[in-house]
Amino acid sequence: MSERHAALTSLPPILPRLIRRFAVVIVLLWLGFTAFVNLAVPQLEVVGKAHSVSMSPSDAASIQAIKRVGQVFGEFDSDNAVTIVLEGDQPLGGDAHRFYSDLMRKLSADTRHVAHIQDFWGDPLTAAGSQSADDRAAYVVVYLVGNNETEAYDSVHAVRHMVDTTPPPHGVKAYVTGPAALNADQAEAGDKSIAKVTAITSMVIAAMLLVIYRSVITAVLVLIMVGIDLGAIRGFIALLADHNIFSLSTFATNLLVLMAIAASTDYAIFMLGRYHESRYAGEDRETAFYTMFHGTAHVILGSGLTIAGAMYCLSFARLPYFETLGAPIAIGMLVAVLAALTLGPAVLTVGSFFKLFDPKRRMNTRRWRRVGTAIVRWPGPVLAATCLVASIGLLALPSYRTTYDLRKFMPASMPSNVGDAAAGRRFSRARLNPEVLLIETDHDMRNPVDMLVLDKVAKNIYHSPGIEQVKAITRPLGTTIKHTSIPFIISMQGVNSSEQMEFMKDRIDDILVQVAAMNTSIETMHRMYALMGEVIDNTVDMDHLTHDMSDITATLRDHLADFEDFFRPIRSYFYWEKHCFDVPLCWSIRSIFDMFDSVDQLSEKLEYLVKDMDILITLLPQMRAQMPPMISAMTTMRDMMLIWHGTLGAFYKQQERNNKDPGAMGRVFDAAQIDDSFYLPQSAFENPDFKRGLKMFLSPDGKAARFVIALEGDPATPEGISRVEPIKREAREAIKGTPLQGAAIYLGGTAATFKDIREGARYDLLIAGVAAISLILIIMMIITRSVVAAVVIVGTVVLSMGASFGLSVLVWQDILGIELYWMVLAMSVILLLAVGSDYNLLLISRLKEEIGAGLNTGIIRAMAGTGGVVTAAGMVFAVTMSLFVFSDLRIIGQIGTTIGLGLLFDTLVVRSFMTPSIAALLGRWFWWPLRVRPRPASQMLRPFAPRRLVRALLLPSGQHPSATGAHE
């Protein structure tokens, strides 16, 4: 046992002594803490859904542009939208339209989740623009309420519920897809995969631990420690997120879980490896415990601080994709470090009491001693070989291509992917994911002058490379409005004359119809004149008869009056009798007396009739006398109309010969669809259809105009992103020198958003990368107390990072044929910076302990002592991260495999060969500014003063120590 170990045994530091003394209490405290944080709040996935943050960069120009469009048009104030796609087995007919109308009514009524519906298919004016060429599919864009992911997810689920509960007609299916639906499904896929990946990881780690330790009990105890760590980390992060300390995302929860598992397992392997090494060296369990703590605590602390610090540097990022990873994973790693420095030693103490952690087999260090010997013997060739291996990955980097299409990285069975596949069968990707250009000025643009400028903007953009279609007020269906060219307007003047000529010819023919009708009227009036004479004669006879009837009725009335006067007493009896109605004879006689009263009324009416008949026989002759002048006037009108018909007929025949095919020029320009001579007259602004178009493409105050631009190909690609700046440039050039000069130009949409994300990712990667590298360098210098060693660690980490990402490009892109998602680069770089220095740190820390034996011997001993442990830990960490490949979210799988490849490269190449070969080449300069001995000091001189002084005392009198050539 070395003197250092002896001193350690005699007076161990206070922290490990306290941990060993209160080991059971510490274990119980951790169990209680884990139980509390998991019972106090819901599970991490549930809290993540309730406190998720929007993944869209809210301060990006493209997102601001979309929100500005919604504000000026009074439609929406968020950037979340879904696309509802209708697909039929046959062309969509009336049933599909009725289903669509019912669905639109439901969506419009749900103002809690739906902000605005861009209903193009419901308007015949724009229906063709949102319908497939075969009429079997149509789509509508629905803007949702919610600027963060939680509200957006609720809105997506609400829309899906309405679509699912509205029965479509036979042969028609409705799908919900679009950016918001994709993001919601991404979160769902990520959350559902956590449990599956965790279970697979646990089984794989258990198998690896069995292979490493050949002990079921040791493997189970390590898994229990990791499980407690994971439960504490998950619960604590969920507790903080539930109290709004920070927000979460799908990537944060997934990476947090596997990082916690991997780091906790690594730290347990570090401790057990050093404990077993000490036990192999003959130390008792207590001494081995203190040796283990002394040799690994600072490494675990440095590793944890490195990971936590590097991950927290992501908090400086602007993109929520990265910013949401910073605080949760950093805090989780700090909890993992705290658990590793307290719970791990406590469990080791309790387990060692029952001899559970004693090694089952002796460590085989011969292989690693040979590796170390080869390195110190041939450091240059070894370093060259490692650089050659690293170049494999580095050479693959230039071929790196990325993609921004989220659909490819989620299961095809997800609802949004099913809907997107249905839409892709009928529509192009660019048509479903257009760019939106907004031009906002300080005056009303609803006039012919500004319409010319707006059409120029649309024309310039449309004629630029990579543009498939531009929809605007002057081209609502993607092409210029028909009949709006100046040649067509000129041509239509002749067409109008020709059309009017045909109309007038028809009206001339109508004159003949009128003449025929007038002839009929004249003949009818002649017959009426003759019949009127007969009517007058008959009326005179009726008048005489009426006078006679009046006289007879008066005589009848007088005789009946005499009869009634004589029988009045008897009549009174019939009216007084109460039961007269029940006696038929009584009631009939009473009715006869009532009839006598009606004779008086009849006589009176006949007298009135006599007077009217006298008036009638006076008026009828006067009416008959008016008919001959009317017949004469109508005959004259008929003759004049015949003359007018002849005159106009001759005139329009001459005009018809002069205007033959006047619309030829207009038809040619319409067929050619040349938009160089666009003009919209003022009268068009009164057209009802054009007014509907104004509402869609111009703001209510007319001061902002919207353009919907479809790119050629997929906008979520580097090629699509490259079209963004040309669109802005063409718009600025189009308004230069016009009344719209100086107008504000906004551009949003899929390509514009990913352009901002790409630029933001570069900035975030630069900021977070520089901050992480600086932080790691500082931590390494503090722990190693060597500037050169710290620089070597950081340098090899950076080299390993580049090589590992190149290997990931080689595997995913070149071998599997799947391009890496855009965020894989930034996330894997930061994570590799965070975890890549662990094994180098452990190696160099052990090398620092063994340096007293000499530089080369120390390298050999350090390689022998740490080779197996570091390789096991690195393999476990790499496999754990690589198991992300089983996630339903392929993005997570790409990130995990990239980190796994990096850790394998770092473990098997950098730590095993590159770093020790650099240390051997640099010699004592590797430890600068520390002063170290290239060779070990003499055993005889070690307990005494410096070599120069001792030799001065031992040499014969008069001999100077320098004569021996010895130097300290």
Swiss-Prot record:
PANTHER family, A to Z: MEMBRANE PROTEIN MJ1562-RELATED, MEMBRANE PROTEIN YDGH-RELATED
Record-linked Gene3D superfamilies: Multidrug efflux transporter AcrB transmembrane domain
Transmembrane segments: 22-42, 204-224, 245-265, 297-317, 328-348, 378-398, 763-783, 787-807, 815-835, 866-886, 890-910
Keyword Protein biosynthesis included in the entry's annotation: no
Pfam families xrefs: MMPL (PF03176)
SUPFAM superfamilies noted in UniProt: Multidrug efflux transporter AcrB transmembrane domain (SSF82866)
Membrane topology, as annotated: Multi-pass membrane protein
Keyword Metal-binding carried by entry: no
Chief subcellular location: membrane
Natural source organism: Mycobacterium tuberculosis (strain ATCC 25618 / H37Rv)
Similarity annotation: Belongs to the resistance-nodulation-cell division (RND) (TC 2.A.6) family. MmpL subfamily.
Record keywords, A-Z: Cell membrane, Membrane, Transmembrane, Transmembrane helix, Transport
GO cellular component: peptidoglycan-based cell wall; plasma membrane
Induction conditions: Transcriptionally regulated by MmpR5.
Protein name stated in the entry: Probable transport protein MmpL2
Compartmental location: Cell membrane
